[in-house]
A protein has these predicted regions:
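A short aromatic-anchored loop/beta-hairpin motif
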Residues: 1-188, 193-249
């Protein structure tokens, strides 16, 4: 990796697939980058709906859903890694703790990982640990992010992302949504996207992706089918303006 590529940090950015990127998973995709460092990157595709609605997902994990604003929302295909497991992107939910104490987070009884229902909860490993294993490929996901100053997330297994967002992998966030509480803005995906050391930088050098700082309105307030064009517009672009060729001439 060059010094220039090592200095790139695309955390809280969008990766926007160039028109010529024909990969089945990432063609015309917008990826929200949750974590990026010299060790790799992790993100969620935010514009590829899967077959499940949120209501269907909640039924599969034996929870009601009393959030009318979420019932018909699609569960997204976040990427090709661990597609049976849920990743919840949402506005940050803080819990105040005494400033003099910085306790390490322990796994409470409601720290069960989010799963799609295709495997029993007992058979599914804690997703946070799985993400760390995947970090051997991407080395991108911190075990549990320690929050700045005297604040930490109210949920058991959460990564804090600059820009006021969190990604939670424990079932407690679904339990909060189930009773009509929880974060106001929510995106749920099955699976995530990961890049190993230098891999994303190589793809950027090949002109596979455009990058732009993330706008949370695109994630949460824009219809799924419009997110690709809306992300492009953050750069002042339309898809027709770009060449279908990927790579250097």
């Amino acid at each position: 990796m060059t010094a220039d590529s090592a200095s790139i940090n695309l955390t809280h950015h969008f990766l926007i697939a160039m028109p010529g990127l024909e990969d089945a998973t990432f063609a015309k995709s917008v990826v929200y980058v949750c974590e990026h460092s010299e060790r790799g990157a992790l993100g969620l595709v935010i514009n590829k709906p899967g077959e499940l609605s949120m209501q269907s997902l909640f039924e599969k994990v034996d929870l009601p859903l009393h959030r009318q604003d979420l019932i018909n929302a699609p569960v997204l295909q976040g990427g090709p890694v661990h597609t049976e497991r849920g990743f919840v992107l949402h506005d940050a939910m803080w819990a105040d703790v005494p400033e003099q104490e910085t306790p390490a987070k322990t796994e409470p009884s409601d720290g069960e990982p989010v799963a799609s229902g295709e495997a029993s909860h007992e058979a599914v490993e804690v997703v946070q640990e799985d993400a760390i294993e995947a970090a051997q490929e991407a080395e991108a996901l911190s075990a549990v992010s320690h929050k700045e100053s005297a604040k930490e997330s109210v949920y058991a297994s959460t990564m804090t992302i600059p820009g006021g967002l969190e990604m939670t992998t424990s079932k407690d966030v679904l339990e909060a949504l189930s009773i009509g509480a929880g974060p106001k803005r929510v995106l749920i995906s099955l699976g995530y996207s990961a890049w190993g050391e230098g891999q994303l930088e190589s793809e950027l050098a090949e002109n596979s992706w455009l990058t732009v700082g993330a706008d949370t309105a695109v994630i949460f307030d824009t219809p799924v089918e419009q997110r690709y064009e809306r992300a492009m517009k953050l750069l002042g672009l339309e898809p027709w303006m770009l060449s279908n060729d990927v790579g250097h001439s």
